[in-house]
Amino acid sequence: MAVPKKKTSKSRKNMRRAHDFLTAPSLSVCPQCKSPKMPHRACPSCGTYKGKEVAGAAKQA
């Protein structure tokens, strides 16, 4: 089984982990109801996508 020859320093460990962070999701505004929604997805509040009513959208009453 392979074993590390040298101890990995804190600096090298942290440099390796520099790209492991999470990015916040980008949000766009729904043109119908002006609520925030994720791009390229149907609006969760009004159920429209590209100006059309999406079948099977859960309406909040």
UniProtKB/Swiss-Prot annotation:
Gene3D superfamilies: Single helix bin (1.20.5.640). It comes from the Bacteria. InterPro entries: Ribosomal_bL32, Ribosomal_bL32_bact, Ribosomal_zn-bd. One of its GO terms (cellular component) is large ribosomal subunit. Residues 1-20 are annotated as: Disordered. Keywords: Ribonucleoprotein, Ribosomal protein. GO terms for molecular function: structural constituent of ribosome. GO terms for biological process: translation. The keyword Hydrolase does not apply. Signal peptide: none annotated. Residues 1-16 have a biased composition (Basic residues). Belongs to the bacterial ribosomal protein bL32 family. HAMAP family: Ribosomal_bL32. This is Large ribosomal subunit protein bL32.
